[in-house]
């Protein structure tokens, strides 16, 4: 059984173009690696500045020059603490303009401005984007209609409307790109984050009838640790035991 159906398979072209670009970039950096001078703080500041390309914060300085929704969501609060509010807002405007133009929110935007999902539609793309918008106080009014359409699409695509949980029968892209899991704890934590962030925002919130802290504890907590997914296999997964506390 394929981890995702033919109907949800993303286009092949972005894989080919991005794969070739990353391969060439990786080869170049092995031959001519860039070295930074200074102490740890100075080096980190230089890397952050190199990740700002004038249009958006790219994920890394070399191989991953794309915009990644998840990675940016992880970094948004820290970037704000480091006084990069202007660049954060410009990155969000860049991403939202391209998402709106292509009628979808995705995991990734190529350096050429084309959104695509790797490897398929991800549960955490919309939650991390909304989180970045909220914590940065980005003025999203002009994108409200588009965001509400994406929230509605997310709810119908991802959520079992009887349980409130991520549909276990569908494989979605996630923090572990190719891992096949059944409604993972991490994915449901992302839905919980989305439900929480939508409160107080002038956006639709179809999740407000569910109590996600209670659902996650009931379905994943075994008294000692959180299960990785609804399969309840007896191993401890790092993401499953980090994000419930985030």
Where are these regions (language model features)?
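Generic beta-strand structural signal
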Residues: 52, 99, 159, 220-221
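Solvent-exposed loop and edge beta-strand segments that line ligand/cofactor-binding
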Residues: 2-23, 56-73, 80, 110-127, ...
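Well-ordered alpha-helical scaffold segments within catalytic/enzyme domains
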Residues: 18-32, 73-85, 127-142, 189-204, ...
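Aromatic-rich carbohydrate-recognition surfaces in CAZymes
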Residues: 65-162, 188
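Low-complexity, Ser/Thr/Pro/Gly-enriched N-terminal "stalk/linker" regions
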Residues: 2-67, 89-90, 94, 103-104, ...
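Generic alpha-helical secondary structure signal
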Residues: 34, 38, 42, 86, ...
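Long hydrophobic alpha-helices with heptad-repeat/coiled-coil character
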Residues: 39-43, 47, 51-62, 139-169
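Catalytic cores of carbohydrate-active enzymes
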Residues: 102-108, 162-173, 180-246
């Amino acid at each position: 059984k394929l981890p995702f159906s033919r109907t949800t398979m993303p286009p092949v072209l972005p894989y080919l173009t991005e794969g070739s670009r990353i391969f060439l970039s990786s080869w170049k950096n092995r031959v001519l690696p860039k070295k930074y001078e200074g102490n740890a703080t100075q080096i980190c500041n230089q890397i952050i500045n190199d990740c700002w390309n004038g249009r958006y914060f790219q994920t890394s300085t070399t191989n991953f020059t794309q915009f990644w929704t998840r990675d940016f969501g992880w970094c948004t609060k820290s970037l704000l603490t480091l006084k990069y509010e202007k660049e954060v807002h410009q990155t969000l405007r860049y991403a939202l303009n391209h998402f709106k133009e292509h009628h979808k929110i995705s995991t990734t935007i190529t350096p050429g401005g084309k959104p695509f999902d790797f490897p398929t539609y991800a549960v955490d793309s919309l939650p991390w984007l909304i989180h970045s918008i909220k914590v940065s106080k980005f003025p999203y009014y002009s994108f409200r209609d588009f965001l509400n359409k994406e929230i509605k699409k997310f709810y119908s695509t991802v959520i079992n409307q009887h349980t409130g949980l991520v549909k276990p029968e569908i494989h979605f892209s996630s923090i572990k790109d190719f891992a096949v899991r059944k409604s993972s704890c991490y994915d449901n934590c992302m839905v919980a984050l989305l439900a929480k962030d939508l409160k107080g925002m002038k956006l639709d919130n179809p999740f407000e009838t569910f109590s996600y802290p209670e659902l996650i504890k009931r379905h994943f907590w075994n008294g000692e640790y959180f299960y990785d997914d609804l399969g309840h296999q007896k191993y401890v997964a790092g993401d499953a035991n980090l994000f419930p506390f985030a």
